[in-house]
Design a protein with these regions (language model features):
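Catalytic cores and adjacent binding grooves of peptidoglycan-active enzymes
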Residues: 2, 43-48, 131-181
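N-terminal secretory signal peptides and thylakoid transit peptides that target proteins
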Residues: 3-27
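C-terminal segment of N-terminal export signals and the immediately downstream linker at the start
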Residues: 30-58
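Solvent-exposed loop/turn segments at secondary-structure junctions
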Residues: 52, 64, 117-121, 151-153, ...
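Active-site acidic/histidine clusters and adjacent loop/turn architecture
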Residues: 63-113
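Extracytoplasmic/secreted envelope proteins and their assembly/folding machinery
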Residues: 94-101, 122, 153, 157
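Acidic helix-start/capping segments at beta-turn-to-alpha-helix junctions
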Residues: 109-123
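Charged, often glycine-rich, active-site loop that binds/positions anionic groups
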Residues: 120-136
Length: 181
C-alpha cells in the first residue's frame, strides 16, 4: 500500500514540476517588442529625408547579420547634407528605430530630420539655437531626429522611453523626437 501511495506521489510531483517548468518558460518568453529583435528575421527600414527629398527602403539585417551594402546606403542617407560628409552610423540606432516601429505597430516611412552632423555643422546650428548640444551624439553617428506621419509625437516618445535603449528627446514645437544610442 505504501508503495502505491509513493508512486502516485511521485507521478503528481513530476506533473507539478513539469507544469512549473512550463509556467516558468512562459514567464520568461520575450515580450513582443523584445521579440522584434530577438527573433532572427530580416529588419527593413523605410525612410524619407525631409531635407534632401530622398527616400530609401533598406533591409539592413537579414536575420543572421548586418548587410554591409545596406548599412553603407543608410550611412549615405543619414549624411550631413550641408557639408556632404558621411560617417558610419551606429547599427544599434537602426535596430532601435526598427524596434520602435514594432512597438508603435507601424512600418510607415520614418521622416528623417537630422542624422549625422559634422562638428562644423553642429557648431553652426549651435550658434543659431540653444537646443543643440556641444557634444551632440549626432556628430558621433549615434543620433537621429525624426517623426512618423500619422503617429502622435507623444506616442513615439513614450515608446522610445519604454525601450530604455538610449537617450530620448521630445520637441513637440519642432515636430520631432530625438533618439540616440
Amino acid at each position: 500500500v505504501d508503495l502505491i501511495i509513493m508512486d502516485k506521489f511521485d507521478a503528481n510531483r513530476r506533473k507539478l514540476l513539469a507544469l512549473g517548468g512550463v509556467a516558468l518558460g512562459a514567464a520568461i518568453l520575450p515580450t513582443p517588442a523584445f521579440a522584434t529583435l530577438s527573433t532572427p528575421r530580416p529588419r527593413i527600414l523605410t525612410l524619407n529625408n525631409l531635407h534632401t527629398g530622398e527616400s530609401i527602403k533598406a533591409e539592413f539585417f537579414d536575420g543572421r547579420g548586418y548587410i554591409q551594402e545596406e548599412l553603407a546606403k543608410l550611412n549615405h542617407f543619414f549624411r550631413d547634407y550641408r557639408a556632404n560628409k558621411i560617417k558610419s552610423i551606429d547599427p544599434g540606432l537602426f535596430d532601435q528605430l526598427y524596434r520602435l516601429q514594432g512597438l508603435l505597430g507601424t512600418r510607415k516611412p520614418v521622416q528623417l530630420i537630422s542624422g549625422y552632423r559634422s562638428i562644423d555643422t553642429n557648431n553652426e546650428l549651435r550658434a543659431r539655437s540653444r537646443g543643440v548640444a556641444k557634444k551632440s551624439y549626432h556628430t558621433k553617428g549615434q543620433a537621429m531626429d525624426f517623426h512618423i506621419e500619422g503617429i502622435a509625437l507623444s506616442n513615439i516618445r513614450k515608446a522610445a522611453l519604454s525601450m530604455r535603449a538610449g537617450g530620448v528627446g521630445y520637441y513637440p514645437r519642432s515636430n520631432f523626437v530625438h533618439i540616440d544610442t
